C-alpha cells in the first residue's frame, strides 16, 4: 500500500511501502483505491501537486487517501494533457491559492478542486500534442533511470578506486 511518501517523479518507490493482507487489499480495491492504467495519481496531502504521474501499468497495489486518483474522461481530455496541465507552475499556484486547506498539513480539497476549469483544445489537437508529450515524458524517464544507474555504478566503483582495489 502506497502513500505520498512513496511517490517519485515517475512512479512509486516500493522500498518502504506498507504491506497489507489480501483481505485489506480487497477492501481497498472495492473502495476504488487501486489505480488503473491512464489514471493520474496526484499527491494531495502535504506537498500537494509535488508528485504527479500517470499509472502506466495495472498492478495489485493500493494507495492511501493522501493520493488522489484522477480518472480522465477521454472523450473530453486525454491523460497526457491532464498530466501536463497539472504540472504547470501556474496551475500549482492557483490550486494552492484556491483549493488547499490546512496549515500544518496542507491538502487539496477534492470536492472544491472538481470545479477547476481548463481551456482545452479539440480532441484531435490533444491527440497530436499527447503524442509529443508522451515521447518527451518517456525520454525524460529513461534519462532519470540512466542517471540512477550511473549513480549506483559510481557509488560502487569510487570507493574501490580510492582504496586502490582492483576493479
Predicted regions and their residues:
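ATP-grasp fold ATP-binding core
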Residues: 2
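Amphipathic alpha-helical coiled-coil/heptad-repeat segments
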Residues: 75-77, 84-85, 90-94, 111-167
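A short glycine-rich beta-alpha junction/loop motif
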Residues: 60-68, 100-127
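Short beta-strand-centered aromatic/proline hotspots
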Residues: 52-57
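Sequence-specific dsDNA recognition surfaces
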Residues: 5-40, 63
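Histidine-centered metal-chelating micro-motifs
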Residues: 49-50, 67-69
Amino acid at each position: 500500500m502506497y502513500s505520498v511518501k512513496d511517490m517519485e517523479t515517475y512512479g512509486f518507490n516500493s522500498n518502504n511501502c506498507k504491506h497489507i493482507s489480501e483481505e485489506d487489499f480487497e477492501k481497498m480495491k472495492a473502495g476504488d483505491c487501486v489505480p488503473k492504467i491512464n489514471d493520474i495519481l496526484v499527491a494531495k496531502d502535504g506537498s500537494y501537486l509535488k508528485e504527479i504521474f500517470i499509472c502506466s501499468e495495472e498492478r495489485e497495489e493500493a494507495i492511501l487517501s493522501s493520493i488522489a486518483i484522477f480518472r480522465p474522461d477521454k472523450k473530453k481530455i486525454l491523460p497526457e494533457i491532464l498530466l501536463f496541465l497539472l504540472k504547470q507552475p501556474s496551475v500549482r499556484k492557483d490550486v494552492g491559492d484556491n483549493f488547499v486547506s490546512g496549515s500544518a498539513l496542507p491538502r487539496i480539497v477534492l470536492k472544491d478542486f472538481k470545479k477547476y476549469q481548463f481551456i482545452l483544445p479539440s480532441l484531435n489537437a490533444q491527440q497530436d500534442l499527447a503524442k509529443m508529450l508522451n515521447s518527451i515524458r518517456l525520454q525524460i524517464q529513461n534519462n532519470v533511470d540512466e542517471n540512477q544507474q550511473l549513480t549506483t555504478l559510481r557509488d560502487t566503483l569510487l570507493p574501490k578506486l580510492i582504496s586502490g582495489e582492483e576493479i
